Amino acid sequence: MSGQVTLQSSDSVDITVERAVAERSMLIKNLLEDLGESEEPVPIPNVNESVLKKVIEWCTHHKNDPQSTGEDDDNRRRTTEIDEWDQKFMQVDQEMLFEIILAANYLDIKALLDVGCKTVANMIKGKSPEEIRKTFNIQNDFTPEEEDQIRRENEWAEDR
């Protein structure tokens, strides 16, 4: 079993990384097991070079973390706390943040997906619908009447 693996981004850039780093992705880990020993680059068709490099940076930092067993999922999901290194890592523009989340989902890196989703959750926590729309540049397509109806239907969920 070789110590290195080459990943090929969607824009055809080859990036060589430690196998242990690449195997933080369950997709890549399963692919490597299925392919056996191969010098061929592993194609990652849905992730471009800049996003793949960010994902690899995260995987390198977390390569010695225990893989998620599923049992710790409930505890992990209940909190929106993010460790300091991950918070700094996620200080990127919105487009890159969403690209990282999509890549983590595609590559099946649950812990990175969690960190990305918690980052977004923390961005909207405590904000009004108007503030959330402004944060994410979302157009309001409700009429004032529809907005009033939705507000009445969801009164129970509002913090008072």
Swiss-Prot record:
Belongs to the SKP1 family. This is E3 ubiquitin ligase complex SCF subunit sconC. GO terms for biological process: protein ubiquitination; ubiquitin-dependent protein catabolic process. Pathway: Protein modification; protein ubiquitination. Disulfide bonds: none annotated. It comes from the Eukaryota. Gene3D superfamilies: Potassium Channel Kv1.1, Chain A. Component of the SCF (SKP1-CUL1-F-box protein) E3 ubiquitin ligase complexes. It holds the Pfam family Skp1.
